[in-house]
């Protein structure tokens, strides 16, 4: 599985890269056919509300795209949320495939 991490208005440091790769890398245990995950991390500055960190993920598997967004005041929390939502979506997709395959075996 290829993980591509990019930053928008944010420098991707080695600790951020390693943390993101660790979190996103866990998806492999739920679904083997993930080809690539593109993660874009960004920050929006606000004088009144503080910084808002965004994590956008686009997962490619078996000709399917799964797109997820997460926002939080903390970058690492946004990455955690992105990983959790991607995990749920991958599980849901995998169940959908299982159900589809079961229906076709009658």
Language model features with spans:
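N-terminal, polar/charged subdomain of small-to-medium soluble alpha/beta proteins
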Residues: 1-106
């Amino acid at each position: 599985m290829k993980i591509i991490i990019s930053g928008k208005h944010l420098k991707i440091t080695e600790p951020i890269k390693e943390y993101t790769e660790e979190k996103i890398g866990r998806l492999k245990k739920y679904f083997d056919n993930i080809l690539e995950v593109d993660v874009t991390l960004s920050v929006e500055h606000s004088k009144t509300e503080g910084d808002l960190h965004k994590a956008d993920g686009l997962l490619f598997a078996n000709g399917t795209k799964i797109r997820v967004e997460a926002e939080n005041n903390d970058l690492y929390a946004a990455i955690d949320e992105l990983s959790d939502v991607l995990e749920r979506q991958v599980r849901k997709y995998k169940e959908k495939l299982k159900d589809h395959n079961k229906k076709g075996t009658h």
